């Protein structure tokens, strides 16, 4: 099953990893991104008895576009997918841009979601502007999504063409062009296996078009239409202290306002926490344990 048909006629793409009979956890990718998380399977989630359900958001991968969507609209899609899969209760993980959507689901679906993890998560912008401490390259992308979307679209189209036509050149350029990243992040963009996964992930993100790569940054920069302090379910906040893509200082100031949040700040780590096996294991373990406190699984 690669796609689920929704009541409004749209489809949502998904990939499943780990223990398919295990505790269900929905995974929300970054921006841009796709459901493709692993080249094959995830031995860690399988070992922990977790059924990892990775979804494409509208316009990415196999999911149909949803014009004028909001962050909170995603909760309705997730609820319908869970119903289709006959899953009554579950947890959610949102990474980077996906953190906004995990937070929105936690706010909207407290009767269905047992626990949530915000990993390297973006935070609400003030007056629609990215934080001053954000990496310059990321700030430029947000600026272009609002002011010069045609230029950002051309950039993503060029990237897509490179992946399709000259994958080895893409790998070479990626290795050379990541000097702006923290060293702990650069190490995950070095091997052929890592770069192959990145290419598949990004190719799926732009499978239909590059339009959502421009729309979603703009969406994230606008009002989320809910307040993080109104989230009532257990939340784990995971963040690298050296993260500049989603600046650590921002989540550090917001996390104390989330009533049932536990913070896990990783020393000498950047943005790609889910690529660190020990951290990924801890994220899943904590999420499952906090869910078990809510209801017997």
Model-derived features with residue positions:
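Conserved HGGG/HGGXW glycine-rich cap/lid loop of the alpha/beta-hydrolase fold
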Residues: 10-62
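Short beta-to-alpha linker loops that shape the active-site pocket of alpha/beta-hydrolase fold enzymes
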Residues: 56-61, 66, 122, 269-270
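Conserved acidic catalytic loop of the alpha/beta-hydrolase fold
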Residues: 73-91
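Conserved hydrolase catalytic core segment
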Residues: 88-132
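Alpha/beta-hydrolase
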Residues: 137, 143-226
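Short beta-strand/loop motif that positions the catalytic acidic residue
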Residues: 231, 237-239, 243
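Conserved alpha/beta-hydrolase "acid-adjacent" motif
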Residues: 244-250
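Catalytic active-site module of serine/aspartate enzymes centered on a nucleophile-bearing elbow/loop
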Residues: 260-297
């Amino acid at each position: 099953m690669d796609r689920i048909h929704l009541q409004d006629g749209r489809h949502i793409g998904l990939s499943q990893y780990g223990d398919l009979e295990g505790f269900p956890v929905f995974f929300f990718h970054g921006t841009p991104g796709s459901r493709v998380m692993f080249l094959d399977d995830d031995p860690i989630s399988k070992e922990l008895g977790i059924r990892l359900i990775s979804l494409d958001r509208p316009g990415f991968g196999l999911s149909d576009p949803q014009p004028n969507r909001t962050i909170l609209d995603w909760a309705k899609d997730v609820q319908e997918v869970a119903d289709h899969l006959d899953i009554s209760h579950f947890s959610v993980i949102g990474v980077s841009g996906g953190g906004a959507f995990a937070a929105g689901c936690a706010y909207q679906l407290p009767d269905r979601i047992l626990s949530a993890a915000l990993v390297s998560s973006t935070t609400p912008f003030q007056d629609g502007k990215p934080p001053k401490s954000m990496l310059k390259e990321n700030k430029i992308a947000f600026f272009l999504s609002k002011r010069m979307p045609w230029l950002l679209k051309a950039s993503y189209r060029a990237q897509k063409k490179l992946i399709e036509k000259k994958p080895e050149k893409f790998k070479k350029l990626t290795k050379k062009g990541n000097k702006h990243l923290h060293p702990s992040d650069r190490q995950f963009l070095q091997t052929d296996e890592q770069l192959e996964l990145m290419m598949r992930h990004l190719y799926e993100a732009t499978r239909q078009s590059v339009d959502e790569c421009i729309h979603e940054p703009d969406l994230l920069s606008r009002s989320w239409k809910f307040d993080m302090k109104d989230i009532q379910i257990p939340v784990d906040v995971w963040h690298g202290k050296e993260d500049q893509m989603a600046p650590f200082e921002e989540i550090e100031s917001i996390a104390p306002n989330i009533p049932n949040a536990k913070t896990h700040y990783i020393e000498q780590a950047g943005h790609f926490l889910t690529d660190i096996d020990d951290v990924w294991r801890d994220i899943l373990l904590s999420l499952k344990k906090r869910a078990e406190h809510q209801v017997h699984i």
